[in-house]
Amino acid sequence: MLAELHEELETIRERFANLRGHLDLAAKQAEIEQLEVRASDPELWNTPRVAQELMQRLTRLKEEVALWNDLDHRMTSLAELIELAEQEGDESLAADLAAELRAVQREVAQRELEILLSGPYDDRDAFLSIQAGMGGTDAQDWAAMLLRMYTRWAERRGYTVNLIDLSEGEEAGIKSATIEIRGPYAYGYARAEAGVHRLIRLSPFNAAHTRQTSFARVEVMPEVDDAPEVEIKPEDLRIDVFRSGGHGGQGVNTTDSAVRITHLPTGIVVTCQNERSQIQNRETALRVLRARLLERELQRQAEERARLRGEYREAAFGNQMRTYYLHPSTLVKDHRTDYETSNVQAVLDGEIDPFIEAFLRANVRES
């Protein structure tokens, strides 16, 4: 068994070496040194938001480089232990060494997946918006189910989730919601979920419990402090303030602290009412607007590339990217990758990583 472990580890180390070659850790180390120089400048903290973004980027880069180096050291130590056990003919250690090998194998697979996140903003935090579509109250309930699913998914990954805006439905569910997801590669993973999600089930909102099809659209945007693709001019903005509303329209705050920003050239409207002050809501709304404008430009570029390949499809409600069947059978099927599972409840509880991984790997094959 020790000889088999040795051969298997060598295969894993070859995969690992190939991954490191794609990653260019030297470039990341150089960026770390550049950011450390900028971080030492006292004037950086005159703009706290920029300073915070820089420090987050620096921390993530250091963590990423440390992860790769630690994994390299683990494999080296494991190889030495296997070799020592082979020399001594001690098979009693085989079970423990095999367990460590499996752990290393899982870690390499995780690093391999992150290599697929090679987009310019994949390592950023994300804003995720959900909009109820066709289906009335059922669609609004479906949007609320998706909000719970993504919140649970983010929490499972150790991400931080902040509610930015929420518009509740008249009878049940939500009309729309926007959350901020903060953590390593939040946008890179979450962008796999952008598109139209379809639910087929027996409606709990009518006496006959007839079969109902509901739709909701999910948008995912990278959070960036600045991007060359985006320019926001003050004269292009209309900013309105209003009183934050809770369930049933009850006022939450004693002052008009909620903010609505309209980007006049594009018609994009962003609201934020979850922060404590009007100034904070305005700053958050501007961050969401910047992210929406960037995602709009990235989508335009992607559509142009798709047209050149003859693959363009309009993002219409008939072009759902995933269907969740609760009746007559239970199944979740992704129409982009054909990945599916019958464990619908687990998916709705946030276990969507297999769908995300299938999407990322399919994108690499297409490119």
Curated annotation (Swiss-Prot):
Annotated compartments: Cytoplasm
Q: Fetch the PROSITE patterns from UniProt.
A: RF_PROK_I (PS00745)
Gene source species: Chloroflexus aggregans (strain MD-66 / DSM 9485)
Originating gene: prfB
Q: Which SUPFAM superfamilies match?
A: Release factor
Q: Which UniProt keywords apply?
A: Cytoplasm, Methylation, Protein biosynthesis
Write out the similarity annotation: Belongs to the prokaryotic/mitochondrial release factor family.
Mind telling me how this protein is modified after translation? Methylated by PrmC. Methylation increases the termination efficiency of RF2.
| N5-methylglutamine carried by residues | 250
GO MF terms listed in the record are:
translation release factor activity, codon specific
Keyword Oxidoreductase annotated: no
One Pfam family per UniProt: RF-1
What is the documented function of this protein? Peptide chain release factor 2 directs the termination of translation in response to the peptide chain termination codons UGA and UAA.
Q: Which InterPro entries match?
A: PCRF, Pep_chain_release_fac_I, Pep_chain_release_fac_I_sf, PrfB
Name of the featured protein: Peptide chain release factor 2
Do you know which PANTHER family this protein is assigned to? Answer: CLASS I PEPTIDE CHAIN RELEASE FACTOR, PEPTIDE CHAIN RELEASE FACTOR 2
